[in-house]
């Protein structure tokens, strides 16, 4: 239930949200049992919440039924204090509305709604799209997701400001790769909007200009270090935060040496988590890249 947008200043979803991979069996089926184990491990190792069925979770290759079953399995296994946010975005408004309603009815703590991809709507179309979603589940907190490098469409701060008239639009995952995106959003939308970095490597710089946390890939591996970095920054120990940031940069870079989530799935395998290969059209990490990744993991 949403009561007051000022909750965003003590962010409703927490500081570290792991964009969790979707584990697959050797046959390519969703491995729900392993998803339960992994999500609980993440919560015990620095994550305040879990984001399911996003980019890292390979949502384009999951059926709506698989996404629903994955949420039910994970949500039912976690402590109630761990927020579970579900990706419900689509480039078809009616599909996104239906998925968001279902997430709300199933007990999700929030929904991650990506900017429509491929069809490249104008700002008016984006406003109508997100308005329809917000109206469909008025008590479900929504996190907008701006990632123009994948969608081919940029959600502008002025449009976000208009969307904040809806009480359940509380936050945004800023994944344009531009630090100034945070500054622009805060200048126009104010501190009521919680801005999350969508890029681990930009977390510390974005914190310095007003971001509240991160939707992270690296937290699969270094969640406690990320938690320490954020705490250090918030408590004025900036030099310690910077030291952690610098130490983790090779990992941040390696996890995007090719298309996400290919590297993180390989990294988890190297760390003892047999989460399976990505579904086609993504392919497994090649051997040369896997050797580079192994070297970096061993140096942490």
Swiss-Prot record:
The record marks 55, 118 as: Part of a proton relay during catalysis. GO terms for biological process: diaminopimelate biosynthetic process; lysine biosynthetic process via diaminopimelate. Gene3D superfamilies: Aldolase class I. It is an enzyme of class 4 (lyase). It comes from the Bacteria. It is found in: Cytoplasm. SMART domains: DHDPS (SM01130). One of its GO terms (molecular function) is 4-hydroxy-tetrahydrodipicolinate synthase activity. It catalyses: L-aspartate 4-semialdehyde + pyruvate = (2S,4S)-4-hydroxy-2,3,4,5-tetrahydrodipicolinate + H2O + H(+). PANTHER family: 4-HYDROXY-2-OXOGLUTARATE ALDOLASE, MITOCHONDRIAL, DIHYDRODIPICOLINATE SYNTHASE. NCBIfam families: dapA (TIGR00674). Belongs to the DapA family. Homotetramer; dimer of dimers. This is 4-hydroxy-tetrahydrodipicolinate synthase. It comes from Prochlorococcus marinus (strain AS9601). The gene is dapA.
